[in-house]
Amino acid sequence: SLVLSLFPEGRLIILGDGTVTYRRNEALLRDAVATLDAKRELLIFPELKLDQLPLLAADLRDGDVVFLASSVLEVDGRLADFWRAGALVSAAVPVPVFVFWDFFMGTGVAGGYLASGVEQGAAAGELALRILAGEPPEEISVVTASPNRWVFDMAPLREAGVDVDDLPDGSVVINASPSIWRDFRGEILLVAIVLVTMVSLLVLLMA
């Protein structure tokens, strides 16, 4: 629902590797869109190969968003590792890329409501400690919900016109501060040139 509200007009493009994990995530996305915005256009590439990225990127337009629902495939059909998939997809497409797992963060993806192996491990550890402390396992409720959290990289979101204030409260945000050099490079260079010119003139006048 967050992505649909941030990008109300664009198409949703789902990329995957054809695995069982991908199929499950694709089904979740389909169900969510059918419930929240049934008229939203979906483009699905269930077994995308890396050499197809240029054609995909050329067809995208402002307002579209990509969901990397698992990994993608190498040219020879092998699974691309997650880091490589995240980096290459986010570099190739001119729109934000949302994901399901926190190990994609840092590759250029925009983020999302992410599952974390660390958080899941911590939850499992808490259950183990309760059992070791003597609590009967049959009295411990089964944990069915993954301890997910909102995690975002503002660099790609800022390029798409999303402000940090548009994100859910409590979100983990990286690259929250804009780069002064990137955003004001022209102004900084102009000021530097003026200062150098003034100093040079002063030196000449004092000589």
Tell what function each PLM region has.
Residues 1-33, 142-152:
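An alpha-beta-alpha
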Residues 23-31, 37-140:
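Membrane-proximal low-complexity regions enriched in glycine and acidic/polar residues
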Residues 50-57, 154-161, 186-190:
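Short alpha-helical interface patches
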Residues 143, 147-180:
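Juxtamembrane amphipathic/hinge helix adjacent to a transmembrane helix
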Residues 175-207:
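Alpha-helical transmembrane signal-anchor helices
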